[in-house]
Amino acid sequence: MEFTHLDENGMVRMADVSGKPPTRRKACASGRIVMLPETIALLRRKELPKGNVLAAAKIAGIQAAKQTSTLIPLCHQLNLSWIDIEFEIGDDSIGIAATVITRESTGVEMEALAAVSVAALTIYDMCKAVDKTMEISAIRLDHKTGGKSSAAEYHPRTAILVMSDSIAAGTATDHSGAILREGLQKAGCAVEALTITPDEPVEIAATVEAWIGEGIEFIVTSGGTGLGPRDLAIDTLAPKFTRRLPGVEQELLRWGQTKTRTAMLSRLAAGVIGNTVVVCLPGSTSAAKDALEVLVPAIFHAFPMLKGDGHA
């Protein structure tokens, strides 16, 4: 198991999320503080000596969510879009629920948990003069959405085609195909083939057509998307698309452009041939890594849709 918060020497470090595209993320956490019924009665009547307990607790919880990266050393500084805290007053306890939303490259679970924790501590502080029996309990993450954990669980049968005269001739080594295979396998895909062909249209087309005939659902190609005379992937495969996937193309180009200025020269393409999704990538290792960040797991939603199972 790979731990992102440990370096090769076992020392703690922040996880590097710079390679992850920002997405909408939401986390909800909850907790409870138990107290005497008499304390609840004072709170309801707003007769506690320190004033409006729940108003102060809500503000404190919101501030705690904003300050999570300061309180917890390895948390990232995030631009939080929305924070809300709600209270449920019972006979002998107060339930606390926090919701935090952001559009960032990592989640806001810790921010939601921090909000609940500090809201509970604030209630404790403001009531402790009249109640020595209070107990904070059951602080937990209820659910989160966004990022990879909320993606569709479908994992397509996959094949990877590397197009390169030099790699096919044995004068160069394939790295991009290996990166794609490792990344897609980690994402749960069954990578059934990794094939290397020269930049020959007939061989490229024959390989892809054979895979489609075998029921391969997801084909990722590497190489042949540039402006050179032997960059023939797009010229060979794009005319076979029954439908283009412009959103996939745009996101791959946009993400690549944030890393490499020359990404705008790529002719990468994405489309559907029958019921097979085909994504044609540049041949660089950086393009392969970027594609994994962009495609996984969002692209997996396409396959149930192609089968007529809707947009769930």
From Swiss-Prot:
Gene3D superfamilies: MoaB/Mog-like domain, Molybdopterin cofactor biosynthesis C (MoaC) domain. Keywords: Lyase, Molybdenum cofactor biosynthesis. Residues 156-312 are annotated as: Molybdenum cofactor biosynthesis protein B. It comes from the Bacteria. One of its GO terms (molecular function) is cyclic pyranopterin monophosphate synthase activity. Catalyzes the conversion of (8S)-3',8-cyclo-7,8-dihydroguanosine 5'-triphosphate to cyclic pyranopterin monophosphate (cPMP). This is Molybdenum cofactor biosynthesis bifunctional protein. It comes from Chlorobaculum tepidum (strain ATCC 49652 / DSM 12025 / NBRC 103806 / TLS). The gene is moaCB.
